Amino acid sequence: MTDLFASGDNSSNSFDDSNDEIARKNETAFKYTTIFHTNLSEKLYHELCALAFGEFDIPQGQISPLMWTRLHEIYSEVEMQTRKLPAGSNYSASSQKYANEAVQIASVLSIYTALAHEYDETVEVSLLSKLVVEDVEFRRIYALLLWSEKAISEQQYEKGLGDKVRKLEGIKSSRINSMMALKRPTFGAANAPKDASLDPDAPGTKEDQALEQMAMNVFFQLIRSGETSKAANLAIDLGMGAIGAQLQLHSMLRNPLDIPLEASKQNFGEYKRSRRAKYYQMTQKLIEQSQGSEDDAYWMLISAIRGNIQPMLKAGKSVIEKVWAYANSAVLARILAAEGAMTQETISTLFNVPLTSKSILDELRSEADRTKEVYILLRVIDDMLNDDIEDLYKFANETVGEFVPNDKNCQVNMLALDIFFHLVAVSYASGFEPNDDGNAVIILGFDDLRARSGTSSHKKMAAFYSRFLPEDMKLPEIVETMKAVDSDEEREILAESLKQSDIDFGRCACTLIEQIRKDDKTKVVTLEEQIDHWHWLLIGGEETALAALEECNRLVRKVMLSTPIDESVIRQIIRKALHFEVPKLLSQAVENEATVLSLITDGTLFEQKPGSQLAINKIEHAALEFYGLCSFVDVNNFMITIALKLGLMFKYTPITDDELSMIGGVKRLDNTTAADWEASLRVRARAEQTLREEVLKKRAAEHNTRVGMVQQHLDTVLPMLRGLVNNIGVRPEYFLSPRANGDPMRVHRKEIQEIRNLFLPQFFILLAQAAVRLDDTTNFNDFFTSFNNDLGLDQEWMVFIKAFYAELNLKVE
């Protein structure tokens, strides 16, 4: 903070000092600034990701002030760290200056972006709020005023303003010395009080005068610190009523309700406006009659209240204090102009100041005594407030264009690169058009990242930034980055970059899916998002083939157990697994004895040793379960087909035209194979189409034809159903049974059992109804009894099925 209040510059950013001690300090400062730079880069990256993925999005395409507030906090931490750099080092001074400026840039932008939201609630009743919300130029100047007050406040309190305020709060009156003198007994002329007086217009004792001067100085600093109300209360408590009243008048200009939108006698708006106008005119006459006493503490205070620019500029020893001088006067002028109680000519005479933020900052930038660092601050704020992003890009490139990573003799401080790289990146992420200057800065930033992280291309951001993270944070941060990617193309690019950077992509992908599963338990992630994230495993090749198939099975189980069941999503998941040839990849992994990763939560690590029995067991079960779940879909399709042709009740959702087009329509395909699981869907689709046509024509197909077709379907589906019932991949008592290390498969086993209980009773009941309708109960009886009551169902469902059969007069014992 202190550097921004200095009037000169003593840094050169060079290491040409011949003095060994100075060189050692510069070396140390460079070393520690590199650490600050690395940590700052990581934090800024997180904020940029949050911005890019919409965390800071608010209506009307704006960015939440929260982003700038968080950046202010980050920069403040770095600024505090730079204060600990070795004193007397040029690089220390340079680092602290840039850290200071980063704090102030974030501060003014956080204030500016928040103003419209803060004043929105009173915009219908307050002129001040209306100006803030609807007049963007007023909002910019007001932001400069509030920012400069905040910065001055921090600086003044560091210098002991708080102690001075507390001292005044402990004094009963500004005439305390007169009071004490008048209380003393007087026994002679020599002891009589000379200048003691309780009259506020009388000079009072020298001690009184010194106390009042100190109070005026404190009030002045409180005004510039944005604490006029505190100054007013303090003045009144000290018995300085006249000053207190004027301070109260000034403080009212910050209260939206004290500046009503519509002036009337009811809200005293007319009186307030006219008297405020007269007050400023009267005060100006008094200042003119003071005959050059502007340096007096009282007149300095009055000039601050009045917005008299020249004394305030003279009192301003730093750029921020001069910003306050201009902004204070400009805000007063704009408010008085909006109130309309004073002519524009009178306002121009009273407040001969620039009335736009750009003109104010241009005025300050034109002063020759400003240092390069302060010039950077003013120009960046000017560009950002006025959306002159092209100039920001140009200036950024001019300032950091010569940066060389890891070069202690580089004339560009690495913290300057952090500031401009992030400002340009934020502008890009906010929708501003890139240009050559902006791109040059982005490339410089990525060159720096590559120099510290090694191998990866700057186009693959995640790989670069992961190099800066502590080892224990690397995997979680990569996983969070992977979560934010929402397109298949981006996933493949990022996956390739992670692999090229020697990062264990398979472990990252498995960790991501583990977190998604946990999020699923707490209902904070949608099914669609889970399917999208599953793509990370699908593109991992043989290494993640087992994990991909396990996650595929979990997603299918999840949809099967949802209410209502979305059959199309189940088919979508299976198609995706087959499109990426997951079963084939898994078979190749076994043949190649490749290391595979598993998500089965049995207490083992992700990585499975090639050829180990546990790995083989997991692969076999995942494959059997996958084909078992596909069999549920196939059998269900045939059951729906049979129900439609026999007019039996069976719950289903019609196939959409889009999905029908995806599978090639309802016609039989010449190249259909035994492994074509879509064949059953086309059979069902033809049945649905036939039913719709019959409804439209109001004519059913000939009975014998229909019976013959159903019989063909039964001949096909019964072997499939037998295989499904006996498939140990969907029999929970096999691979999913409790183990020596506990019962890690309990949830998985429960889901499989629930699926069996849900689907198999429906299948057997429909088959029984079909057997009765076809008068073929004998064959059905043989089929059912061949299972010896071992359908892998809970006992209650076996009882339910047999009870239903009894109602149909089917004997199955």
From Swiss-Prot:
Lineage top rank: taxon: Eukaryota
Pfam families, A to Z: Nup84_Nup100
GO biological process, alphabetically ordered: cell division; chromosome segregation; kinetochore assembly; mRNA export from nucleus; nematode larval development; post-transcriptional tethering of RNA polymerase II gene DNA at nuclear periphery; protein import into nucleus; protein localization
Phenotype on disruption: Larval lethality with about 9-12 percent of animals reaching adulthood. The few surviving adults are sterile. About 10 percent embryonic lethality. Reduced nuclear growth in P1 embryonic cell and delayed entry into mitosis. 39 percent reduction in him-10 kinetochore association and 34 percent reduction in air-2 chromatin association during metaphase. Loss of npp-5 localization to kinetochores during metaphase. About 10 percent of mutants have chromosome segregation defects.
Entry GO terms, CC: kinetochore; nuclear membrane; nuclear pore; nuclear pore outer ring
Entry keyword set: Cell cycle, Cell division, Centromere, Chromosome, Chromosome partition, Kinetochore, Membrane, Mitosis, mRNA transport, Nuclear pore complex, Nucleus, Protein transport, Translocation, Transport
Annotated localization: Nucleus, Nuclear pore complex; Chromosome, Centromere, Kinetochore; Nucleus membrane
Cell division listed as a keyword: yes
Principal subcellular localization: nucleus
Subunit structure, interactors included: Part of the nuclear pore complex (NPC). May interact with mdf-1.
PANTHER family listed in its UniProt record: NUCLEAR PORE COMPLEX PROTEIN NUP107, NUP107-RELATED
Family (UniProt): Belongs to the nucleoporin Nup84/Nup107 family.
Protein name (Swiss-Prot/TrEMBL): Nuclear pore complex protein 5
Species lineage: Eukaryota, Metazoa, Ecdysozoa, Nematoda, Chromadorea
Gene behind this protein: npp-5
